[in-house]
Regions:
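Active-site-adjacent structural segments surrounding the nucleophilic cysteine of cysteine proteases
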Residues: 1-66
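Conserved active-site-adjacent core of cysteine acyl-enzyme catalytic domains
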Residues: 43-167
Length: 169
């Protein structure tokens, strides 16, 4: 694989093409890299020229919890996006149904085995398509997606709305 390999948006952190790569000091993308996958999907949706190899090389030591074994720190997600020119706003869970429209969202949900990041990319019809969520990418309203997580014993604990940087003409 080289820097020009294009995976597009990623829907599985366990994909054999990249899942066993190190993440943090002791983790792997497959086991603990959902935060990195969410970041990649947001950045890739904003700029289709982004490729996984250079993205991974630049972020493989992003701040993690417990040396990578407990995934990505939420503050690292926000900091990384803001450093790249993205506008990031916290969305109150109780107000998600009426939240303003963003180019993308990142959901942090708690479930039986720990926490999990899921990126949603805005569609033209007013929904988001959610990636790396243990099933096929699904277009849904944000509030419906959060309810679907609750219905499967996952509990949304944080949601961020993301606006993509303005491209120079």
């Amino acid at each position: 694989m080289n820097e020009t390999t294009d995976f597009g948006l990623l829907n599985s952190q366990t994909d054999e093409r990249y899942g066993e790569r190190p993440y943090g000091h002791f983790g792997t993308i497959a086991k603990n890299g959902c935060g990195m996958i969410a970041l990649y999907n947001i950045e890739r949706a904003a700029d289709e020229t982004i490729r996984f190899e250079p993205f991974y090389a630049a972020r493989k030591q992003i701040k993690t919890n417990f040396f990578g074994l407990l995934g990505t720190r939420p503050s690292s997600i926000v900091k990384n996006l803001r450093e790249k020119g993205f506008e990031v706003q916290k969305i109150r869970l109780k107000k998600a149904e009426h939240a303003e429209r963003y180019d993308g969202v990142i959901v942090l949900a708690w479930y039986f085995f720990g926490a999990h990041y899921i990126a949603g990319i805005a569609n033209s019809e007013g929904t988001y398509t959610f990636y790396n969520q243990f099933r096929r990418p699904t277009p849904m309203q944000l509030s419906a997606f959060l309810q679907s997580l609750k219905n499967t014993k996952q509990h949304p604990i944080r949601v961020w709305g993301v606006r993509f940087p303005q491209k120079a003409n």
